């Protein structure tokens, strides 16, 4: 079978012939795994939307109907719900690899990637509201109410988002429409991400530009991607059929129908938002917390500016590598603090220390370590 195509399929040739560094590892597989996750989420989401009812009196029962009465509906629901967790696991590994190996040197590719991450978080949040359980309702109420921290116009924006004076049927309809639309926006951004990647090509673990030591993407790296696909599909099968895993990542409160008159014992988002939620809670001021929440994501956009080292990869930089693993540990600590009871010690103190280190790493340590790295590089070059 001839691999190279003509006409509308001509872009496939760019994938087949893409010059790829020969020394990239399995950490570079997560990009293709994310494409597979996005495809599975869109497919299962479209099938679920055929049976879902975006009405406050029917939403919860329609989800129960999907699980109980629709053929293989329970697989669709749990693959879609837990697939979001797998999606974010792959995203965080992909971002971590980019930070470790200096992928932000491809500035436009990095910016589009951060935008994809932001849209992903928005899509996941509004999707969490759709089952209309207790945590869905109160999570939507608390998180959307944060917009009221904007001076002067915050209250009006919140009412515009809600479509009224509280989270109601209008809110659910809007969130369902956006949750159906945004994945296709993500597809467009992913295509833009790939197009920008093809301009300069992928980076490599050494963090240096090498135009000679490259191989075509097919067949050397498609085989590695296929192996990753098989492993990921195996995980999807397990989370779809194993009862003890299906609901492991689901909040028990969300199996209770939403009741505006009963507040849950704790209100928290899904685990992949907990690090940002902990940063939000660590700032006593409401507006400051909201700004810190958005800054925790948008600070990634500054990485191409903050890191001015000549060799971006941390492979041969033991000091920067040491602090990188500190920020990884800090991410897990923030995730843990986000799930802890609000306003209780020592969680408040730990959360504030972890928040300071989170921003300190990006805004202080990264520029400082880059400057020191350049000094050592120039010193070794002159001796």
Swiss-Prot record:
Its cofactor is heme b. GO terms for molecular function: metal ion binding; ubiquinol-cytochrome-c reductase activity. Heme b b562 binds at residues 80, 179. It is a multi-pass membrane protein. Heme b b566 binds at residues 94, 193. One of its GO terms (cellular component) is respiratory chain complex III. A ubiquinone binds at residue 198. Its main location: mitochondrion. Keywords: Electron transport, Heme, Iron, Membrane, Metal-binding, Mitochondrion, Mitochondrion inner membrane, Respiratory chain, Transmembrane, Transmembrane helix, Transport, Ubiquinone. It is found in: Mitochondrion inner membrane. GO terms for biological process: mitochondrial electron transport, ubiquinol to cytochrome c. Binds 2 heme b groups non-covalently. It comes from the Eukaryota. The chain crosses the membrane at residues 30-50, 74-96, 109-129, 175-195, 221-241, 289-309, 320-340, 345-365. PANTHER family: CYTOCHROME B (PTHR19271:SF16). The main subunits of complex b-c1 are: cytochrome b, cytochrome c1 and the Rieske protein. Component of the ubiquinol-cytochrome c reductase complex (complex III or cytochrome b-c1 complex) that is part of the mitochondrial respiratory chain. The b-c1 complex mediates electron transfer from ubiquinol to cytochrome c. Contributes to the generation of a proton gradient across the mitochondrial membrane that is then used for ATP synthesis. Belongs to the cytochrome b family. This is Cytochrome b. It comes from Trichoplax adhaerens (Trichoplax reptans). The gene is mt:Cyt-b.
